[in-house]
Swiss-Prot record:
It comes from the Eukaryota. The gene is CGB. CDD domains: GHB_like. Glycans are attached at residues 50, 140, 146, 151. Stimulates the ovaries to synthesize the steroids that are essential for the maintenance of pregnancy. This is Choriogonadotropin subunit beta. It comes from Aotus nancymaae (Ma's night monkey). Disulfide bonds join 29-77, 43-92, 46-130, 54-108, 58-110, 113-120. GO terms for molecular function: hormone activity. It holds the Pfam family Cys_knot.
Amino acid sequence: MEMLQGLLLCLLLSTGGAWASNEPLRPLCRPTHAILAAEKEGCPVCVAFNTTICAGYCSSMVRVLQTVMPPLPQLVCNYHELRFTSVRLPGCRRGVNPVVYFPVAVSCRCALCRRSYSDCGNLKSEPLGCDYHTSQDSSSKDPPRNLTSPSQLPEPADAPLVPQ
């Protein structure tokens, strides 16, 4: 009987470990697929393209007595390694460079937010997209005619970053 109780105890403890797993409930900071949009003055077409961004959760702490102690620095999901690639905007006026360069996440890490190259604000209520104030009446609910359909999204072509 004592051996059976020991076996039962081991079984319960091992199962409890599976329930209380170390895995987080939210995805950690990692490269994630995203669809972004690019537009440029002098180019009539907004182009949506596939890329990889850094997204996910980083561990953070908040002090209980915030008035007595300074706030703790909060970590955010940042690029660790990145490469640059480009997308070509069609139909640009003569003299306008149709190439738009953007970063592609190779790896990500939790670090302090650097405002020099990151948007440190809250999540946006609307996804990133093109500005249609000049090309469409604001009362219209129809989608813009000049946005590439999702089935025709270009994959970014690898290109070295060339200074303009």
